[in-house]
Amino acid sequence: MFCIQCEQTIRTPAGNGCSYAQGMCGKLAATSDLQDLLIYMLKGVSAWAVKARELGLPPTEADTFVPKAFFATLTNVNFDDERIIEYARKAESLRNVLKTQCTEAAQKAGIRLESLPDSASVLLGTSKPELLEQAKAALPNLGKDDIHEDVMALRLLCLYGLKGAAAYMEHARVLEQQSADIAAEFHRIMAFLGTDSVDADALFTVAMDIGQLNFKVMAMLDEGETAAFGHPEPTQVNTKPVKGKAILVSGHDMKDLELILKQTQGKGINVYTHGEMLPALAYPEFKQYPHLVGNYGSAWQNQQKEFANFPGAVVMTSNCIIDPNVGQYADRIFTRSIVGWPGVVHLEGDDFSAVIEKALSLEGFLYDEISHQITIGFARNALMAAAPAVVENVKNGSIRHFFLVGGCDGDKAERSYFTDFAKATPNDSLILTLGCGKYKFNKLEFGDINGIPRLLDIGQCNDAYSAIQLAIALSEVFECDINELPLSLVLSWFEQKAIVILLTLLSLGVKNIRTGPTPPAFLTPNLLKVLEDKFGLKNTTTVEADLNAILNVA
């Protein structure tokens, strides 16, 4: 086992990364190794998908399967060995079909196919022990003693960044948003990673390509969500329980939430969002369901306590899942799509009757708690509608600075930095937030500036697209570069979606971003220095020091 993809990975003087019997996330060594083997096989699929396009063959299932299966290897998504093996075998099958099609097409055209990496032809073993033995050749740090540490760091940066983009591609696909051009670029990069390049410059260029790719993916996902559910609008949301039977929907999948709401109509069940599903309550389409009563709980890392206390059924539509046996609720949590946990019921298709039956069999909430309202829904359209008022308040001096404070949440005590930072921002500034990092401060009162709320909840982590669009609009109004705006980005990271959003911002030329609470363990000091020199990327220090530096206070 070697895994170094998330913020909570082991860090020691002897080296970084989880490389023992179990990772910090609870992932067993065998599961980690099987995920590495799956990624290896997916690189082989992409290698042939690239060849197929070069030969003029039509797109295949690989365009959707590879990103989806890649998503399954994201932090806190799938811990089920059998499901991972199933994905790997399907990858082998798809690859073999593509290989045959390409070979036949090349023969007809009189073209000689160049050799491809081993992942394009290796045959999987028939047993789990054989697969685990094969996985030794798929470790992400394979050959680390023979190549420069910066090259290894760049490989991992690209791998984890592309993994984040794959997750957003799958979210978009669920909403019937796909692009042949995006799929082609994804396969190109995936196939390139399969060559194990030692060219640092080429790897750095590909990292920026991944950022550019993800910007297009986020735009596609934004289109999918708004086409299906309307544009989010400022909305008051209750964060306290309501009396009655209950279902909790966590993850990111709005389509699953819609299906659950339709199937629970008239059944006396209240539905709650959790974690990154909170923004759903701001979409017009969901407001037709009175039994969508609010948001329960907070960010992913608190689920073992929150789910244990939730007296109903829970559905995990995507990341993040952690061991449900700790809180003894494994018998009433259900997984969907790419999510998996051994022994937990996995739902295929669109029938949620098992969830409904479980919810009806449970006690539910016995009484209403006193309502506590928070405001959400300041996504792209709402921000653009508010832009004239924002511009006027900037011009008259009422608004002097913008802060984007958000990203991933996590366990570490150091993450209290983001709570303290938000609380310390001056009263003449606006705070934009997104992702589950918002839970560090989204129930606090920040007041308003001439009717404009100081705290503007943009939405899910992928709604960084909305923040980018606002920054572009403001830069056009003020006729300046984005980096000349009074805008500072302070981002918390945990996993691979955050990595690709960072790459997206860097690829767009956004500079002077602060990230925390710690730098990615897979990045070397030298590479961090390159990112600082080229983009002004900095790690968070203390709230006082960072705010003083941002606001040029001596």
Swiss-Prot record:
Pfam families: Prismane (PF03063). One of its GO terms (biological process) is response to hydrogen peroxide. GO terms for molecular function: 2 iron, 2 sulfur cluster binding; hydroxylamine reductase activity; metal ion binding; peroxidase activity. Hybrid [4Fe-2O-2S] cluster binds at residues 252, 276, 320, 408, 436, 461, 495, 497. It comes from the Bacteria. It catalyses: A + NH4(+) + H2O = hydroxylamine + AH2 + H(+). The keyword Ligase does not apply. GO terms for cellular component: cytoplasm. The modification Cysteine persulfide is found at residue 408. SUPFAM superfamilies: Prismane protein-like. [2Fe-2S] cluster binds at residues 3, 6, 18, 25. Binds 1 [2Fe-2S] cluster. Binds 1 hybrid [4Fe-2O-2S] cluster. Its cofactor is [2Fe-2S] cluster; hybrid [4Fe-2O-2S] cluster. It is found in: Cytoplasm. Catalyzes the reduction of hydroxylamine to form NH(3) and H(2)O. This is Hydroxylamine reductase. It comes from Shewanella amazonensis (strain ATCC BAA-1098 / SB2B). The lineage of its organism: Bacteria, Pseudomonadati, Pseudomonadota, Gammaproteobacteria, Alteromonadales. The gene is hcp.
